[in-house]
C-alpha cells in the first residue's frame, strides 16, 4: 500500500504513527493493499485556501477529504479493489486548539482527524444522526483498536 505524508505545516508531527494508523484502518476495513492515500499536513492559511476552494466556506478547518476512486470498505472475502483512495488535508494548528479544548493531546487529535478523513474517503458521513452514529462509532472502534486506549472525544460536529 502506498501511504504518503507530506508535511508542509511547519509543525513537527509523528508522521510514522499517522502512516501506521492508516495501514491499520486499511487492514481493518479490508482496503486493497495497493490502494493509495495521500496525507497532506498544512498550515492555517493553506487550509483556509483549501476550505474555500473545496467547500466554499471561509476559515481554516481541521480536516478535508478529497476522494478519488470512490472506494468503499471491503469484506474478508472481497477486499476493496485497487485504486486511489484519495487525499486528506489536516491542519496541525487547528488540531492543537481542538485538542486543548477537548482535553487530550495534539497527537491524539491528529490520529482522530486522520481516521475521520479516511472514513470520509470511504463514503462515510455524519450529516444526519444515524450516519453520525455509524461513522463516529466506527471511528472510536478503530482508534481504540489502534491505540489500545479509550478514543479521544470527537471534536468535529
Swiss-Prot record:
Cofactor note: Binds 1 zinc ion.
Predominant localisation class: cytoplasm
Cellular component, GO, one term: cytoplasm
Superkingdom of source: Bacteria
Signal peptide start-end: none
Cofactors, names only: Zn(2+)
One record GO biological process: rRNA processing
EC number: 3.1.-.-
Catalytic class of the enzyme: hydrolase
PANTHER family: ENDORIBONUCLEASE YBEY, CHLOROPLASTIC
Protein name: Endoribonuclease YbeY
Amino acid at each position: 500500500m502506498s501511504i504518503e505524508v507530506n508535511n508542509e505545516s511547519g509543525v513537527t508531527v509523528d508522521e510514522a504513527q499517522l502512516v501506521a494508523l492508516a495501514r491499520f484502518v486499511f487492514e481493518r476495513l479490508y482496503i486493497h493493499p495497493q490502494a493509495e492515500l495521500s496525507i497532506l499536513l498544512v498550515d492555517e492559511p493553506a487550509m483556509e485556501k483549501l476550505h474555500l476552494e473545496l467547500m466554499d466556506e471561509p476559515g481554516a478547518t481541521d480536516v478535508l477529504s478529497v476522494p478519488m476512486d470512490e472506494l468503499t470498505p471491503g469484506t474478508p472475502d472481497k477486499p476493496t479493489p485497487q485504486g486511489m483512495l484519495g487525499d486528506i488535508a489536516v491542519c496541525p494548528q487547528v488540531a492543537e486548539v481542538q485538542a486543548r479544548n477537548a482535553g487530550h493531546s495534539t497527537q491524539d487529535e491528529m490520529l482522530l482527524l486522520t481516521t475521520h478523513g479516511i472514513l470520509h474517503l470511504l463514503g462515510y458521513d455524519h450529516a444526519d444522526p444515524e450516519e453520525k452514529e455509524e461513522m463516529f462509532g466506527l471511528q472510536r472502534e478503530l482508534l481504540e483498536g489502534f491505540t489500545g486506549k479509550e478514543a479521544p472525544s470527537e471534536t468535529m460536529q
